[in-house]
Curated annotation (Swiss-Prot):
Forms a complex with DabB. InterPro entries: DabA. The keyword Cell cycle does not apply. It comes from Bacillus cytotoxicus (strain DSM 22905 / CIP 110041 / 391-98 / NVH 391-98). Its main location: membrane. This is Probable inorganic carbon transporter subunit DabA. The gene is dabA. Part of an energy-coupled inorganic carbon pump.
Length: 874
């Protein structure tokens, strides 16, 4: 229940205010309040974002109720989504009615259960109450006659921002005006070199820069500017002063700050992320709240005497009565003849069995149906076969759901074994491309890099390459500067019009050819030299982390990753380490289609480093001493899986043995067929696409190069499960590109350490991806990022709708919906399936408190495939 926007004249009582707040305490309040938002990475390094990561100590149901209460955000699937899933046959209604019976068993009532059950079953149809019934004079008269039924009133337990309770004389909520101002200042401060003029005094901090400029802001009234001019110069003091002026009691400060953070969770999220990146900005979130709440005081100050913070909201009787008449077959006359006690009980049942609970029961049945069908698919394909198959090549892919169809097609095409592992390949590294001083943390975002790896070339080749790259960069930079300059922007259309006009025509009508031409032209011009890596340990004066690895670290990382892959024996002549990347044009969300395990970057860099390490004689000697013997004729190579076009690009091929060369030739021979089949399967799932494609590969390339294409691929939509086990468990299953697949052999993991590492790393990445897609589907207006066609890239950080919206944090509408009315992504919580004996799962849950909390509180689902008892839900 959201707070009413009606303002009463009852002032907040003075005795409720206890502003004995020390400035040093305010940071503790801010830190505690930050649990309600999640860090938001810049869109150029888009990383999956679990919106409720700080709330996992509460159950999913509690968080759903809380969000509905304080923000009116519903995070259960809508009735239309449930109806669509039912039409598609994705919900077994036996699970629905089993859930209903469990709910009825948990309730206590004094009327016949059969009567309640009939009502509930009818209400589960999720049809709307007829409007003529809700508006009927007889029903409203009956509601007025029922006395003392709705005796319970609900006091709002969280302090809403005062600005959200007030409207100005133009009937505009003051919260909207406040948001407009805060967005403006956030864009100015956080701008990542997109604008030509930087915010003055930005280097001194957000609050200081704002305080310096606010007295000149023409969007504020003269009185507001004067009041803020005399405001404290320190952010902590300003925040304490604002809370005191607004008369927020100390016991409500945290919830009041939470309300403000949830008002613009995108901007607050990227500020939270920035605060964790450097010591200099560690208090940035406090500064943000100081700016926001100081401005709130200035805007609402004339209205403060009118605000009532303790609003109560009564439950409306009319829809409860209507529900029993519509679904319970009770007439108004029968209602009139009931005793007050019976009326109260029926209304209480209707109140508790509300639409949110009904949709929750359907949603849980949807999840149970998915789990049941997945278990049937897996168990029905199991057979005992101890015969070792001949394997010509082993190919390790990222666990990404887009790898599953490609791996399936590869295995059908030849004697190949595919392996699933997180696409950073166990290397906790930050990577620096050739000639770049910038490094990118190429590992899951919840981890920190321990080593920096630089791409190297000879001095002469590097110098020549950097010169060509500088020319390439200068052209685009000059164009940008001319476009933003007051004078040259007038001349630019005349100079560039003919060229840009031709480019527009070519981009629109022959996108594949033009894209290929531009890419080849740039590649020819840059002529990137052959490179190597700084793999050997060296102290880095530019960074806190060292360059390269020691000999022991090289051996340890390779050993750990090979064990995670379950690849410690029976090596094929060729082992291919496959990272993955995407390809799209005019797409701000390009990084969202890259490797999540590599922090939103392509995985080829990590793949090449790992393959190189595996080929080093010193590493092989170290592995051999620990019992992992790699044959001399086994060679590790690296490739990159292009998910948008389902092709494999070789990025590292060392000198090959004869058997490895044979394997490579075989892979290259079957790759066109594999790509054709994988593209055909994937493209058929795109909306409004022809069912018969003459050339799927050509169509896939057109999607990748077309600058008007809002959906070059589905990304990780429809992800629903994370399966940890041997490939034989799922090899004969068509998992429809919905499963993250990670290899695991419990027989080689007596201690359980490997399983714990998989859950803590890749398992967490998969959960974050799953919940980001979930949130963007069920609450796109709050957790999604809107329509790609109307987005505005702002401040070099992310996207907005228009020029004054929240910084949008989720995936776009086109990534989860196949039409305006039909969702493509199924909003189901991630089902983690572990192939291991039950005692392994019990040990994992006992040792890993965080994971146990996720399972117990309903943030993930858990099942296991026990070699003795089969499938088991936990």
């Amino acid at each position: 229940m959201s707070v009413s926007s009606v303002v009463t004249k009852e002032s907040f009582k003075k005795k409720d205010v206890n502003m004995n707040i020390q400035e040093k305490d305010i940071n503790d309040f801010v830190q505690s309040a930050s649990r309600v938002i999640a860090p938001l990475w810049p869109i150029s390094t888009f990383a999956a974002r679990h919106p409720w990561v700080g709330l996992e100590k509460q159950s999913f149901e509690q968080v759903a109720d809380w969000l509905k209460e304080i923000r009116d955000v519903d995070i259960y699937p809508s009735a239309s989504m449930i109806h669509s899933a039912k039409r598609r046959g994705e919900i077994d209604e036996s699970f629905l009615y089993a859930g209903l019976h469990r709910w009825l068993d948990s309730q206590s009532f004094h009327i016949p259960r059969e009567k309640v059950e009939r009502y509930c079953q009818a209400a589960l149809k999720l049809d709307k109450l007829p409007s003529h019934l809700l508006l009927s004079k007889e029903l409203n008269t009956l509601a007025a006659e029922i006395n003392n039924v709705n005796t319970e009133s609900t006091e709002d337990f969280s302090m809403q921002p005062i600005s959200s309770l007030i409207e100005n004389q133009d009937s505009e909520r003051l919260a909207n005006i406040l948001d407009y101002h805060v967005i403006k200042w956030c864009k100015l401060y956080l701008d990542n070199f997109q604008s030509s003029w930087a915010m003055p005094n930005r280097e001194k901090g957000f609050y200081h820069a704002w305080h310096h400029l606010i007295k000149y802001d023409p969007a504020l009234s003269k009185q507001q500017r004067k009041a803020l001019k005399d405001w404290p110069q320190d952010a902590n003091a300003a925040l304490v002063r604002a809370l005191s002026e607004l008369k927020i009691p100390k016991s409500k400060i945290q919830t009041y700050l939470e309300g403000h953070l949830l008002s613009l969770p995108g901007w607050a999220g990227i500020i939270l992320w920035r605060s964790k990146q450097s010591i200099r900005e560690h208090a940035l979130l406090t500064e943000y709240l100081a700016v926001r709440i100081s401005m709130e005081w200035a805007i609402v100050n004339p209205y403060l005497s009118l605000v009532n913070h303790r609003l109560k909201k009564k439950v409306s009787i009319v829809p409860l009565l209507a529900s029993w008449i519509h679904w319970g077959d009770l007439s108004i006359e029968e209602w009139s003849q009931m005793s007050a006690t019976e009326q109260n009980e029926l209304l209480s049942i209707a109140h508790h069995f509300d639409e949110k609970l009904r949709r929750k029961l359907w949603w849980e049945a949807w999840e149970q149906t998915h789990a049941e069908r997945l278990s049937q698919e897996i168990l029905s394909k199991q057979c005992v076969n101890n015969k070792k198959k001949f394997v010509l090549a082993q190919m390790a892919f990222c666990i990404d759901v887009r790898s599953e169809p490609f791996r399936r097609q590869l295995e059908k095409a030849g004697p190949f074994e595919t392996i699933g592992i997180a696409g950073f390949f166990g290397l906790p590294i930050a990577t620096s491309e050739l000639g770049s001083h910038h490094s990118h943390p190429s590992l899951p975002v919840m981890q920190k890099p321990k080593h920096r790896i630089k791409e190297l070339a000879s001095e002469d080749e590097l110098k020549s390459y950097q010169q060509r790259k500088k020319v390439d960069h200068s052209l685009s930079y000059t164009f940008k500067m001319m476009k933003q300059n007051v004078l040259t922007s007038l001349l630019l259309p005349e100079l560039s019009g003919p060229f840009l006009g031709l480019q527009m025509i070519a981009r629109s009508f022959v996108p594949r050819r033009l894209g290929s031409f531009i890419r080849n032209l740039r590649k020819t011009w840059l002529r990137k030299p052959d490179t190597r890596f700084s793999l050997d340990y060296a102290h880095d004066t530019e960074s806190e982390i060292p360059i390269g690895f020691s000999k022991e670290e090289k051996v340890n990382y390779v050993r750990q990753t090979l064990k995670m892959m379950g690849l410690t024996e029976n090596f094929a002549p060729l082992v291919v380490i496959c990272g993955h990347s995407s390809q799209s044009t005019n797409n701000p969300y390009a990084a969202a289609l890259e490797c999540g395990a590599c922090g939103g970057a392509a995985g080829g860099f990590n793949a090449r480093i790992f393959a190189t390490l595996c080929n080093l004689p010193e590493v092989r000697e170290g592995l051999s001493a620990e019992g992992i013997k790699i044959p001399e004729d086994t060679v590790f190579a690296a490739a990159e899986h292009k998910t948008t076009v389902d092709e494999l690009e070789w990025i590292y091929i060392p000198e090959l043995s004869e058997s490895a060369r044979e394997a490579l030739n075989h892979i290259e021979a079957i790759m066109p067929k594999v790509s054709h089949n994988a593209n055909r399967e994937r493209l058929a799932q795109l909306p409004n696409f022809k069912t018969k494609m003459k050339n799927p590969r050509a169509e896939a390339h057109r999607f990748a190069e077309d600058w008007s294409e809002i959906r070059p691929e589905w990304g990780l939509a429809r992800n629903a499960s994370f399966i940890i086990g041997q490939r034989e468990l799922t090899q004969d299953c068509d998992l429809e590109g919905r499963a993250f697949l990670h290899n695991y052999d419990w027989k080689q993991d007596e201690s359980g350490d490997i399983l714990a590492s998989i859950i803590a790393g890749p398992g967490t990445v998969a959960q974050w991806i799953n919940l980001q897609y979930y949130a963007s589907t069920v609450a796109p207006h709050y957790y999604g990022s809107g329509n790609k066609a109307t987005q505005t890239v702002t401040a070099g950080l992310g996207v907005m709708q228009g020029n004054a919206s929240d910084l949008l944090s989720g995936v776009p509408w086109q990534s989860v919906m196949q039409s305006d009315d039909e969702a493509y992504h199924s909003p189901l919580r991630l089902l983690i399936v572990i192939q291991a004996p039950s005692q392994y799962i019990e040990r994992l849950l006992n040792n890993d408190f965080i994971f146990r909390e996720k399972v117990q509180n309903g943030w993930v689902r858990l099942a296991s495939v026990d070699p003795e008892v089969g499938w088991k839900n936990w």
